[in-house]
């Protein structure tokens, strides 16, 4: 009787694994279909990294989310005045879109803004990043990193107002220095850098990185070694 009960448990467990496998494979099929442009860019880059985005939304599997490009993103830390100034005066004139309203992701896992999920932009996208600026909000308030931003009040929110007191020449210097720090190419280095990358996309997926055991390893192999017979499979 005991052995039969144990056998029943194994059968139930096996059925649960089969159901999970079908669900995960269905999710991966959907993401690879909707995000094929992004996945092809990752493969071409050979960066062998994933990008992550933190979210306070909770999901055991994945969520499809809409970006704030049309409505404008409400900044979590940076003041709205500074946020708008960066878009209007620095990023839009160079890249043609409000970079600070983009969807931010990084190859570095950052749990400060919620649970880190694997990030997949859907459809075509544009991106902007900096080889020197890891996180613009952090760097804007760190004198040692942006020495040209030398005039601001001690309280971080006052930065937006103290900048208004700069001369036109000083503002132009600030704008040019920031513009020169950003670029919209070299996707391989952008992914490898662990710096923030702003994506211009309409929709994107956040995928639970603990969906299965070693799920990140599974995704890395599926993306970067699609033809390999020895690629990792969490269900075997």
What are these regions (language model features)?
Residues 8-98, 208, 220-222, 230, ...:
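ADP-ribose/NAD+-binding catalytic cleft of ART/PARP-like enzymes
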Residues 46-49, 114, 194, 202:
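Sequence-level motif detector for i,i+2 pairs with an aromatic at +2
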Residues 136-236:
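Active-site-proximal loop/hinge segments that shape catalytic or ion-binding/gating pockets
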Residues 83, 87-159:
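ADP-ribosyltransferase catalytic core
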Residues 1-3:
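Classical Sec-dependent N-terminal signal peptides that target proteins to the secretory pathway
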Residues 33-43, 106-110, 183-186:
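Intrinsically disordered, low-complexity boundary segments flanking structured domains
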Residues 53-60, 107-110, 120-125, 193-194, ...:
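Short, flexible beta-strand-to-coil junctions
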